[in-house]
Amino acid sequence: ALHGANGEDGKVQATFDLLGIPYTGTGYLSSALAMDKSITKQFFRAHNVPTPNGVTLKKGQESEPLSSFGLELPVVVKPCCGGSSVGVYIAHTNEEYWQAMKDAFSYEPEVVVEEYIEGREFSVGVVDGKAYPIIEIAPVEGFYDYKNKYKAGSTVETCPAELSEQITKELQGYAEKVAEVLGLNTYSRTD
């Protein structure tokens, strides 16, 4: 399993495929698709997997008002293809929004802006098409950003998450569907 740039985005897998080197895990195309938040949102919509309303903006479009995209504050701003929540912000004010856009565009030429949905965060692992117990991820403060992902003691993870049987089955079903739709045929994690 590879983490981070070149590993999660399919570049290492593509290189191995070209060189005929066997590896475990998902192939290059599915890895690349899964890292692109704009494309995954399109796949999710096409297959009835819930995803927040949002828009993908290219550099130069950041000055257009949120209302022109059917969005209003608060919103989540994130680089299109990044990982580990690098460059991800929850913007509650116009000032926070403009700063978030500036920072997100410093990572990539495309940014995803989504409606902010307040709630709990969960992670569902899928191996060979079967979902595993759900993990609830609760940051001690703020949201599950880069700092909270990698600083010891900054999050509380509960497994299995305290959820009704109905919600558990629903979330696991969506994670299995995501793995199927994106071709993540070995193992994956859906948040």
Q: Could you describe each region identified by the protein language model?
A:
Residues V111, E115, N185-D191:
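A short glycine-rich, hydrophobically flanked beta-strand micro-motif that places a catalytic Asp/Glu
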Residues H92-G173, V178:
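Phosphate-binding site of ATP-dependent enzymes
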Residues T24, P52-N53, Y132, Y144, ...:
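A short, local hydrophobic-aromatic micro-motif
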Residues A1-N53:
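Conserved N-proximal alpha/beta basic substrate-recognition cap immediately N-terminal to
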Residues G4, S85, V140:
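Glycine-rich phosphate/pyrophosphate-binding beta-alpha loops
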